[in-house]
Amino acid sequence: MTDRGTTCPSPDSDSPSETPESRPTKSRAWLIAVCWILGVGAVAATRFRSQWDAYRSIHQWAANNGIPSSLRNYDSLLIYILAAVIGAAIVSKVLGGRTTETLRLSGSQSGIARMLALATAPMILGGIAVGLVRGGLNFDLSAAWPTFSSGVIRAPIGEELIFRGLLVACVARMIGWHGRVFWINAVFASLAFGSIHVPWNHDALGSWPAFLVTSAGGVWYVWLLARWRSLWVSIGLHAGMNLGWMLMGASGGAGGGGWIENILRVATIAVATKATLRMSKRVES
């Protein structure tokens, strides 16, 4: 909870670790390259890992020993976590600070829980209501777990660590949190985020709505990260919106859903945006 006079970090304020010594210089451009190589490498590894004989053998062994696919597929989250942590550790080693600070997983979290509760209410509560009306709300944990595990745990944590934590927050240690260069990098990170939500084949052209909506959502998540300077905001919203989508039984990914689903999604975006503008506004003395 946040007192009326409490605000989250202003977008114009620097964190304690952003000292003059750690501001961007041309000689540190290689750190940006390291972050992007790790990020792209992690995405490629998760996308193509099923083509590796050794990987298939391990998964077959796990399946034969009764390990369900919903648990076996946590290897994708592990890949994302390793890439993000390694990248943040390298940046922190060179520029100073802690790895968790560089990834924006630590520091002031004032007001975040309150904002997330308000913002995700339309999607989650609306999702429960819509699911009950449609008769598709599944209270069988064993049946709902695979979808919940993938959409509410693996995807929000892994994708936010890579596309906002590694490719935006870590890179911001070199280029700053403002200006054209920051937003150019943010757009490229968001396009990469959108690309993992469409097929990487000839069917991709038919998935352009999902690509555009997801990429735009990625830019919005970056804006939230820049305002709050906390990755937990985008992780929480990402998880909450996916949970609402799951409860409603919506189909079509980010570019799909009917008018009810999209009204609730817009409501969540509107509440989060308004709350962010109000709660992150600098208090004038």
How does the language model describe each region?
Residues 1-104, 128, 243-285:
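N-terminal, membrane-interfacial amphipathic/helix-forming hydrophobic leader that caps
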Residues 7, 109-111, 234:
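A generic structural micro-environment signature
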Residues 12-14, 125, 202-205:
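A generic alpha-helix propensity feature with a strong bias for hydrophobic helices
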Residues 28-36, 72-81, 111-119, 143-148, ...:
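Residue-level signature of transmembrane alpha-helical entry/exit and packing/kink sites
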Residues 46-50, 130-135, 209-210:
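Solvent-exposed, well-ordered amphipathic alpha-helical segments
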Residues 55-72, 93-162, 168-178:
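Juxtamembrane helix-loop-helix connectors linking adjacent transmembrane helices
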Residues 74, 86-87, 122-123, 127, ...:
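Membrane-targeting and insertion segments and their boundary/processing signals
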Residues 146-285:
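Transmembrane helix-loop-helix hairpins at the membrane interface
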